[in-house]
Amino acid sequence: MTLSIRPDTVSAAQMVSSLSTQQTPTVTEAEMVQAVRTLLIGLGENPDREGLLDTPKRVVKALQFLTKGYNESLDELLNGAVFTEDANEMVLIRDIDIFSSCEHHILPIIGRAHVAYIPNGKVIGLSKIARVCEMYARRLQVQERLTLQIADALQGLLKPQGVAVVIEATHMCMVMRGVQKPGSWTVTSAMRGVFAEDARTREEFMNLVRHNANFH
């Protein structure tokens, strides 16, 4: 297994800007279906043959599902599931399955996220952490930005002592095409608050999540 370590290369300001770039679709679903038909023809296929008759509609529906995070918001997602609590020790959810799509080739990114925070008077429903990961993953992404968005969303929502996010993923654009390197994994991290400032806290988190990735 090869691990490709990518540092946090996107600033918080760039991350916030990226959250506000969603635009209202300017084409209809019928136009999207026609575009897929055109792609099939361009590939030398016949979209009117039996096996492909409904493929354009299916592709559009699949892409809409895979990018449904654009139509979700943190407020709707949380639904008030933030609670006052005196807890001040690390809360960690490990091995959250991540399915995203790379924005360069629209091919799958498959991996797992490890998310921790140290409360500062507020805690969040555990399932909501997974849902935050899901919301940002269901968009066209790069792994670096996905990692930062999850960390900064939780930091903004809870104002905790700190947030830590690590994502380990394999990118089909490196496996199925291009360099064709199955078995390579990309690891990204984002540390906020005490996780960035205190080496011992960061090391405790890394020790808890350190394990061999196994997504077979």
Curated annotation (Swiss-Prot):
Record's keyword annotation contains Ribonucleoprotein: no
GO cellular-component term (any): cytoplasm
Protein's GO biological process: one-carbon metabolic process; tetrahydrobiopterin biosynthetic process; tetrahydrofolate biosynthetic process
Enzymatic class: hydrolase
Superkingdom of source: Bacteria
InterPro entries listed in its UniProt record: GTP-CH-I_C/QueF, GTP-CH-I_N, GTP_CycHdrlase_I, GTP_CycHdrlase_I_CS, GTP_CycHdrlase_I_dom
Pathway entry: Cofactor biosynthesis; 7,8-dihydroneopterin triphosphate biosynthesis; 7,8-dihydroneopterin triphosphate from GTP: step 1/1
Protein family membership: Belongs to the GTP cyclohydrolase I family.
HAMAP family linked: FolE
Subunit note: Homomer.
Protein name listed in UniProt: GTP cyclohydrolase 1 2
Species of provenance: Nostoc sp. (strain PCC 7120 / SAG 25.82 / UTEX 2576)
Gene name of the encoded protein: folE2
